[in-house]
Each structure stands twice: as C-alpha cells, then as structure tokens.
Amino acid sequence: MGTLSKGTGAVAGISQRQGRYKRSAPAFLIILAALVLLLGYSMILSVCTGIAGGSFKVFAETVMSPAKASGVGMIMLEMRMPRALAAGLTGMAFALSGAVMQGITRNPLSDAGLLGINAGAGFFVALSAILFPAAPDIVKTCAAFAGAALAVFMVYGFGAGKHRSESFRFILAGAAVSALLTALSQAVSLAFGIVKSLSFWSAGSLSGVTWQSLKMLSPVILSASALGLLLSSRLSALALGEDSAASLGVNVRTVRLFGMLVVLLLAGASVSLVGGIAFIGLIVPHISRLLVGGDYRRLVPVSALMGGVVLVLSDIAARMINAPFDTPVGALVSILGVPVFFALTFRKEGMVL
C-alpha cells in the first residue's frame, strides 16, 4: 500500500473541488450510526424469525449460554445465526464491491458482475459438481472462489493497456469474459445433466451457509472491506477524472489494480458463500449517493452498511414468503431491484459519480 499513500495530503482538498457533499459531518455520522443500529436489529430479527418460532429472550439465553441451547435455541445457534451473519457480511461485501467497481471504472452502471465474477464462479461450481459430485460443500465454495479469481485475471489481462484510460477496455473485456464463462457453464451443465442441482445456487441462497464456511470466508471479507475503506479517498480523486487524479499525486493504475483486488476478494468470497445475488452492488451505492453525496470517503462505508441491511431483510422475506420452503433470495432481490433501478435511472439528476 506504500504506493497508494502518495498524494494523501493533496486528496484532502477533493471535497471542495467536487462540491458533492449533500450532508454535513454530523448528519453523516447520524446516518452511519442509524445504519449500524438497523443492521444489528435486522440481524437479531433474522435470528428470531422462522417457522419454529423464537424470541429475543431465547436469543439472549442462547448467546449467553450456547452450550445449554436446545430446541429453538439450537436452531438459532446452528442455522439462523450463521445465516444472519452471512447475510450481513455478504450484503456489505456486494454493496462495497459495487461502489469500488463504480469508482475504478467511473461507470455508474458497474458492479462486480462486470469483472465476470459471477460467471467464473458459476463455471467452476459446475465443474466441481461434475468432477467431485460427492465432495462436501466446502469444495464447491473453494471452486467458486477460484473461478471468480480466474475471471478477474482474464478481464485484467485483456483490459489492461499502455495508457491510463482503461475503463472502456475493462468494460468490454468484462462483458466478453462473462459471456464466454456463462456459455461454458450452461454447456457443461446441460451436457452432464446438473442444471437442476445448480439452479438454486445460481439464483442466490443463504440456506446452505454453515459456521465452517463462514469462518473460512469472513476474514477475507473483513480484510478486503478494510482495504476498500483505505482506497476511498483515492476513488474520490479518480472520480474527478484520471488527469485530475494524477495531478493530485494519485497513481491511477495502482488504485485501479488494488480496487480490482478488493472487488475480487469481496465479491468472490460472497458469491462462493451464497451464490450469485445481483443488483445489490449496482443499486445500493446509488441510494447511498442520495444520502451522503458522491465522496467515496462517505459513500463506501454507507454503501457497505446499507447493503448488509438490504440483504438481511431480503433474506427474512425470502424465508417467510413461501414458508416452510426457501425462496432464492437472489431472485427476490432482483425482483425488488428492477423497479428501484428504473426509478434511479429516470431521476432528473441522473446517475452521477
């Protein structure tokens, strides 16, 4: 990160040049605190909600004495708690990766899917189901992460150029790699008859989350989130334009490289844990801009917290819509996200970075 530290002092004047603060510092802190409380409350609500029942009293007793948990308490401990934590973490990761992706490409329609992460993960999950059909779910998780990494490396290899202006090349490379890996995934699934077994994962679901997979991937998500927060001031500089960012002492290519690393770690870990969940990384950053403006030092943390809230509440709804059966939360988020996306698109202000 030594290279990224260059120009930190110069970046301090970005807010005056952007003129995009929509809230004062106290208002921003209030919004941040409200989102933290809302995220905590929604996660507790998720643990206490289900067809087997539950209450805050049982939740508190289970947290205080997990060894004594039984009945509903055991369901909370072994099934609902890892699911709620995974929803919060992956929702934060999807939204934060979307904000970072929009920052490094300077494209308000970008999200992690632009790097082919979902397509790469899906292709490798299909391969793992064919090659290791009896393997535990952790193998599928590792395969998904490996596929996401391969997709990002392919996009970066095709999209990187000799000049600083690489955003358009990345977009084209991402679209091409996504189309290729999606086609390969569909061909393999049809050829080996595994379409049905992969459909629930590809639609996005938190039903298969375990403490084991959560413990393996949560350090990745938390570390990448911290790196994304460190990048936020450089993303604000990049939003002014590549030449302006360079004049402020920001190494554009290095910021873009670290930004892609953040997106890979966040979205790759999340997709491997809960499957492909679209629209959170695209829509949540736009909603966050309406609250705190376009400065990424405010946009990144607010997007992360709001993404966690959105996915936790969506998962609660997905569990209760057709109880006792699970509705894929990715499908529900997409259904709710489309009208929100159109509403944001046709705002008079437009979608500005």
Regions found by a protein language model. Give the residues of each.
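Alpha-helical transmembrane segments in inner-membrane proteins
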Residues: G2-L353
